[in-house]
């Protein structure tokens, strides 16, 4: 089975100059998990996740342990940091180390990419790196566990 049969099409994208305020709105209020960043020709240049945004705002988790860091930042400190970063754009915060899949990639290869790279979503691009959609780990698992129930029944018999 190919990625194109399970991928989610027409993803919401942002361009390199999209302001941080719009990105916050899309990831926060629209409950998107990933925003592909594209150029004028819709070619994938990077991705932005909620984690990418938070890395700029929240100190390393170890700093939250009060015994090691008694002056841990407050929500107000984080709000102040957001205000300081309003000039940032997608190109400033995007992750350019992006793993992607192609529409004709085998589903199990895409699943392997997801697992090896510790990501839950892969952008799907064509040969020209134009964004076509994205494949989500849970969609693959849902397919495997619901649609291929008979496969797992056979595996159970083999184990016995």
Predicted regions and their residues:
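Extended hydrophobic
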Residues: 115-116, 120-123, 127, 136, ...
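Short hydrophobic beta-strand motif reused across regulatory alpha/beta modules
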Residues: 47-49, 53, 134-141
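Bateman/CBS regulatory modules and CBS-like beta-alpha motifs in cytosolic regions of diverse proteins
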Residues: 1-32, 37-40, 44-45, 69-113, ...
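A short, polar/charged loop-to-alpha-helix boundary motif
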Residues: 54-70, 141-155
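Contiguous N-terminal and early-domain "leader" segments and peripheral loops that mark the onset or edge
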Residues: 55-61, 106-109, 118, 130
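Residue-level detector of secondary-structure transition/capping positions
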Residues: 14, 28-31, 52, 61, ...
């Amino acid at each position: 089975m190919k990625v194109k049969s399970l991928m989610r099409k027409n993803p919401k994208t942002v361009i390199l100059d999209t302001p941080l305020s719009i990105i916050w709105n899309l990831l926060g209020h629209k409950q998107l998990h990933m925003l592909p960043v594209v150029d004028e020709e819709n070619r994938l240049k990077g991705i932005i996740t909620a984690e990418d945004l938070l890395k700029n705002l929240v100190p390393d988790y170890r700093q939250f342990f009060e015994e090691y860091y008694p002056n841990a930042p407050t929500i107000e400190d984080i709000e102040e940091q957001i205000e300081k970063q309003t000039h940032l754009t997608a190109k400033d915060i995007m992750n350019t180390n992006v793993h992607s899949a192609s529409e004709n990639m085998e589903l199990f290869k895409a699943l392997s990419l997801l697992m090896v790279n510790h990501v839950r979503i892969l952008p799907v691009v064509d040969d020209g790196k134009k964004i076509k959609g994205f494949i989500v780990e849970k969609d693959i698992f849902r397919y495997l566990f619901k649609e291929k129930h008979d496969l797992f029944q056979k595996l159970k018999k083999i184990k016995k």
